[in-house]
Amino acid sequence: MGVGIQTMWSILLLFSCIFSAASASVSYDHKAIIINGQKRILISGSIHYPRSTPEMWPDLIQKAKDGGLDVIQTYVFWNGHEPSPGNYYFEERYDLVKFIKLVQQEGLFVNLRIGPYVCAEWNFGGFPVWLKYVPGIAFRTDNEPFKAAMQKFTEKIVSMMKAEKLFQTQGGPIILSQIENEFGPVEWEIGAPGKAYTKWAAQMAVGLDTGVPWIMCKQEDAPDPVIDTCNGFYCENFKPNKDYKPKMWTEVWTGWYTEFGGAVPTRPAEDVAFSVARFIQSGGSFLNYYMYHGGTNFGRTAGGPFMATSYDYDAPLDEYGLPREPKWGHLRDLHKAIKSCESALVSVDPSVTKLGSNQEAHVFKSESDCAAFLANYDAKYSVKVSFGGGQYDLPPWSISILPDCKTEVYNTAKVGSQSSQVQMTPVHSGFPWQSFIEETTSSDETDTTTLDGLYEQINITRDTTDYLWYMTDITIGSDEAFLKNGKSPLLTIFSAGHALNVFINGQLSGTVYGSLENPKLSFSQNVNLRSGINKLALLSISVGLPNVGTHFETWNAGVLGPITLKGLNSGTWDMSGWKWTYKTGLKGEALGLHTVTGSSSVEWVEGPSMAEKQPLTWYKATFNAPPGDAPLALDMGSMGKGQIWINGQSVGRHWPGYIARGSCGDCSYAGTYDDKKCRTHCGEPSQRWYHIPRSWLTPTGNLLVVFEEWGGDPSRISLVERGTALDAKKL
């Protein structure tokens, strides 16, 4: 190619790129989001990048695309990206730019929910814990320290996206951004400061000039030009606060979260499809499945408190990235049917006619197109309806879609996809376990602090660990009557949560724990004390920090008292104001026993002398990765409570000892769904299997470390492959 021609080609290419970026635009009217001048029905799904591994991302995105999605929606997780003030992290599972670019490579759009409050059953709602200790701070209100920190992080994310040219107006995939998150109920509770904060947040976000619309979910008074959107199991009755804004549903709840101690929620595919079709027929044009792939709360990222390590959410793609049938396929077919109506849906508003006492037709008819949705809202009875000269059979609680106003191509209750059954197949058991017992900490050790009275746990640990020791000495005189009459004194402890192990003179006296509904707990038990000095050691254990509510700066955990000892010669002692010695974390954590190098720093016991069913015990074993690429999990059904690591990476908290309470029974797709309906695994562990990402393994010599708080039988831990088997018949 000649120099002149090459120069001309370069100029043309440059102008082409400039024109392409300049012509890219995102706007909206009352019908839809408008991308580059085209009104779109947009189907989205939530995939949270830190809840899977970078190696999983391409397959998850591809399966989302194959499932008929146009958009991937994700939160931005502030505490993962700014673990300490001004120190940012965007690597590995937190490589946000890489994730967005992978979405772009598949030709999908992105809805970036910057927040930076996320809720999401994520630790502290996504806020970094250091934020709680900024002087004068009050969270999510008209408070200058909070607004300054929030604006700084939001600007950081927007600047990164702009630098990588990731907004649609730059030729990138981001078509929408979200500021704040479900703030409406909080604003209603706190009043004027909340309203001022909402106005400030909207103005701040719009001022960042991203070139794409901003949204606020569950925010009825979202200031213009911000679009208010709906979250919920159903959103057909939602209307945006201005007639010129589109009807958007940012969270179609495909299931519900699992909490330790709770049954496992499911939501029938038919009802999810029904809710979506009902939203579309009522004029909705953007919907997002929360979650499309839930993933895993690796490490200590689970919030709640008491959120399980699994964030499966009964999503169309399960925790391991496998399609959940029939939900994935049934929704794929729904999306195809909706897309076949797109031209009519974005052109006109529907006309609604009654077809029966509990049946309706929603018809979108323009000069060139006609699409109809025939709905049966009856939860018990099928009906035959007449429409446009034809007869249509509508099962209970269902909607049929007719892209040409004549031909039914889809009904939400008629499932064409095959159902699948989960299979967990053992591939490795009989690990060569070794044990190391974590001895009870004493007050005279190093790295301890002695203070007058009881102190809040997170204030001391700064959430660097789940564990905080509270220690004091109880001196018993030789003349105490209980030493002779055998009536042991009653020790009573009140804690803000979340779990507590009580040790006296190195021996476990009892364990208590709370729940998501009531994280506070109390211990009250007659205890064995001897004449002289008795060592009382309380191991307070957090199980994730709350992710929703008001006044985050006031939340607490740990032993706040009172602590009393009743049944002494002098009556009852109030020990709350005594001198207490504090130690953050465990010895094993400080030694790094979960790492290859740290695990060699102590003497481990193996064989017949190995500890079993002992509290505060570390276990380690090595194993080779099984062949193949099937997803892997650990079956922890024989263990109590603790944490798991693979090659130094934290799988998360295990707690199979917390048995699911509640009621499980028959599940009908028909009728209004809520999170108490269609629950499973009552009377079983809330979570038995724990996801082990393939990418964390090497072919040989993988280090598996388990810390067990209660005591368990590690010999029964096994590595399993997760797979699915399709039912022979269609539903």
Curated annotation (Swiss-Prot):
UniProt catalytic activity: Hydrolysis of terminal non-reducing beta-D-galactose residues in beta-D-galactosides
GO annotations of cellular component type: apoplast
Signal peptide feature range: 1-23
GO biological process per UniProt: carbohydrate metabolic process
Entry EC no(s): 3.2.1.23
One GO molecular-function entry: beta-galactosidase activity
Function: Involved in cell wall degradation. Degrades polysaccharides containing beta-(1-->4)-linked galactans, acting as an exo-(1-->4)-beta-D-galactanase.
Name recorded for this polypeptide: Beta-galactosidase
Organism: Malus domestica
